């Protein structure tokens, strides 16, 4: 009897060891997948809803949190991003009583990636409006980060009756020729990934080689979408310089003082173009300020949204 029990325990221990080894090998080969799985688990454990809706015949994924009957905020991510990019900021708004919707733009995250779509900011703005229509959101407080800010500007300009307040986080949209290599948003080598991180963060940490490889692999799967979006933006046909002064709703401009993608001077230009805008600068923060500097930013965003 004891011999049988020992054999059973040995078999169980061996199974555990094998599972740990397989899991460890999986993590080394696909760390991005493990990180995504952790994020999805975090969403489930914190009551964040993950849903899809049909917009113009496409499946658009979105996250939602906060009380169902609360005032609505829609947050739009940037180039190469997804709904999870708002994971640090959205809880501030949700805890303050807002219903926060975070769509994955077409071609990003868990939304469809149709080959025939242009992925221009103008057409993505149409997807955002279609998303609002599909959910029956007549008027929202709209926020956008980086390229998502440009998209939010277009929505606010073309549909001002749908936007009660506008929040722009390190936003694109002005006619400015970048002084950095736009190909870095689709890195193919660890060195290029390092260059991208220097642009995104004031003090980037070294990325382990196995993580860098998987990040490059993951970006590569949707790299054609990013390239198409960048090519469209570089034409400058959808810039908003001449239209921003037309905005009448309250506007909050949020910027990291160390943003190397869109330097602080662009925030100041945007502030001048929108007379009623409020500019909040966060010292020491870079282009990823909504993700990395949320402790300082969150309360100010909530205060603006509540006014």
Residue ranges with predicted function:
Residues 260-266:
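Conserved alpha/beta-hydrolase "acid-adjacent" motif
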Residues 277-307:
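Catalytic active-site module of serine/aspartate enzymes centered on a nucleophile-bearing elbow/loop
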Residues 150-158, 163-194:
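Flexible "cap/lid" loop of the alpha/beta hydrolase fold
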Residues 29-34, 184-248:
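Conserved alpha/beta-hydrolase catalytic His-Asp/Glu region
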Residues 65-110:
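Conserved HGGG/HGGXW glycine-rich cap/lid loop of the alpha/beta-hydrolase fold
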Residues 247, 253-255, 259:
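Short beta-strand/loop motif that positions the catalytic acidic residue
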């Amino acid at each position: 009897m004891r011999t049988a029990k020992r054999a059973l325990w040995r078999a169980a221990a061996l199974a555990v060891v094998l599972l740990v080894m397989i899991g460890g090998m999986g993590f080394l080969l696909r760390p991005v997948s493990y990180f995504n799985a952790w994020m999805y688990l975090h969403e489930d454990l914190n009551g964040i809803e993950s849903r899809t809706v049909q917009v113009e015949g496409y499946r658009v994924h979105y996250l939602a949190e906060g009380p169902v009957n609360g005032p609505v905020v829609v947050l739009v991510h940037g180039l190469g991003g997804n709904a999870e990019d708002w994971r640090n900021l959205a809880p501030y708004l949700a805890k303050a009583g807002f219903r926060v919707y975070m769509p994955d733009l077409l071609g990003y995250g868990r939304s469809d990636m149709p080959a025939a779509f242009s992925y221009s900011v103008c057409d993505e703005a149409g997807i955002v409006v279609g998303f609002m229509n599909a959910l029956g959101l007549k008027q929202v407080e709209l926020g956008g980060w980086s390229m998502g800010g440009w998209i939010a500007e277009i929505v606010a300009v073309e549909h001002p009756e749908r936007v009660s307040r506008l929040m722009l986080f390190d936003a694109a949209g002005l006619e400015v020729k970048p002084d950095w290599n736009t190909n870095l948003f689709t890195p193919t080598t660890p060195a290029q990934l390092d260059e991208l991180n220097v642009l995104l963060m004031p003090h980037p940490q070294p990325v382990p080689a196995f993580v860098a490889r998987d990040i490059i692999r993951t970006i590569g799967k949707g790299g054609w979408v990013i390239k198409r979006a960048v090519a469209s933006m570089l034409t400058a046909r959808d810039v908003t310089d001449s239209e921003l002064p037309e905005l009448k709703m309250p506007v909050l401009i949020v910027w990291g003082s160390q943003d190397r993608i869109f330097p602080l001077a662009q925030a100041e230009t945007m502030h001048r173009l929108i007379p009623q805008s409020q500019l909040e600068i966060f010292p020491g923060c870079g282009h990823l300020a909504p993700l990395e500097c949320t402790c300082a930013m969150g309360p100010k965003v909530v205060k603006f949204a509540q006014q």
